[in-house]
Regions:
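Interfacial segments at transmembrane-helix termini and the short loops linking adjacent helices
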Residues: 4-20, 204-233, 239, 279
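Interfacial transmembrane-helix starts/ends
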Residues: 111, 148, 179-205, 222-225
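Hydrophobic alpha-helical transmembrane segments
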Residues: 18, 47-96, 259-264, 278-295
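Small-residue hotspots at the loop-to-helix junctions and early N-terminal turns
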Residues: 17, 141-152, 221-226
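Interhelical loop/hinge segments that connect adjacent transmembrane helices in multipass membrane
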Residues: 44, 48, 72-79, 88-128, ...
Length: 295
């Protein structure tokens, strides 16, 4: 498959395609290292590195954007540069500590564990992106932009839920190992209440956020916020069960549930966007995440 194929698929120039693949190659190294830090409760180093990346990204972006007329390209490449530099450092660090590139036992285990997760993560990408693509193709670009604004505001809670899940996952694994199931139950109930309240607050104040930050032509987005904000609760609900499936290496169940949810989202969008317009995509998203969470 040549570069022209990827250019046609993503509708992007070659240098941005290469930048994207470089980021995909190096970003996992930081993910591997950060997961180790979380599981060993070594948060000081993780927080320090995260702050360094958070500062380097915008600072380099400002410098590069102000230094060229190609503003958008400069911002993208500066962001990729930061990710690649940090990723390269952690790749070298991991390889140095591991001192061994190939180990048949671990490679086989990693392949068997992660192979079913490839369709799972592709399906999750479909669930997150297909709405806007289908609205763009079936209704129009402006409606896709309005939906995108509503989706961004509605999913603000994901910043919180992702941090909560990253912290809760090591605790879950260690509690299962110690057979301390009661602590998992009590903390799970508490954080579910916190997330539910957060989603309700987004529903309540999301329209005000749009009215303040977006021009009038985007005000129609307020009707999409409630279902998409409710979807965030079920996005968070799934990993609580999924982490347990991961612990017991039952990744095939995760794959099947996510694939069903992704296919259902495409079908429901195709049917209901034609009938009710682009607003229907918010409700099909909610229905599919509910289906995904209970599957």
């Amino acid at each position: 498959i040549g570069m022209n194929f990827w250019n046609s698929v993503f509708e992007l120039p070659s240098f941005l395609i290469l930048a994207m693949f470089l980021e995909l190659l190096f970003v996992p190294a930081f993910g591997f290292w950060s997961n180790i830090q979380r599981n060993e409760y070594k948060y000081k180093a993780l927080v320090l590195v995260t702050l360094e990346m958070s500062l380097a990204n915008p600072l380099l972006g400002i410098v590069t954007v102000l230094s060229t007329i190609y503003k958008a390209e400069a911002r993208i490449l500066s962001m990729v540069f930061v990710q690649v530099i940090f990723g390269l450092f952690f790749y070298i660090l991991i390889m140095y500590k591991g001192r061994r590139f190939y180990d048949k036992k671990y490679w086989k285990y990693a392949f068997l564990f992660n192979a079913p997760l490839i369709p799972h993560y592709l399906s999750m990408t479909v669930l997150q992106q297909v709405d806007r693509i289908m609205i763009n193709n079936m209704v129009g670009t402006s409606e896709a932009a309005i939906y995108g604004v509503a989706y961004t505001v509605s999913t603000l809670m994901i910043l919180v839920t992702s941090a909560m899940n990253n912290s809760f996952t090591p605790f879950t694994y260690q509690s299962i190992k110690k057979k301390n199931y009661i602590s998992i139950k009590s903390i799970t109930n508490l954080i579910l209440i916190i997330v539910a309240v957060g989603c309700i607050l987004v529903m309540a104040f999301g329209p005000e956020v749009i009215s303040i930050l977006a021009p009038k032509q985007y005000y129609d987005a307020i009707w999409i916020i409630p279902p998409v904000a409710a979807s965030v609760f079920f996005m968070f609900l799934y990993p609580l069960f999924g982490n347990i499936e991961f612990y017991y290496e039952k990744t095939k169940f995760t794959m099947m549930a996510s694939c069903v949810g992704a296919v259902a989202n495409i079908v429901l969008n195709y049917v209901f966007i034609r009938i009710f317009g682009y607003h229907a995509a918010g409700y099909t998203t909610l229905a599919c995440y509910i289906m995904f969470a209970i599957a």
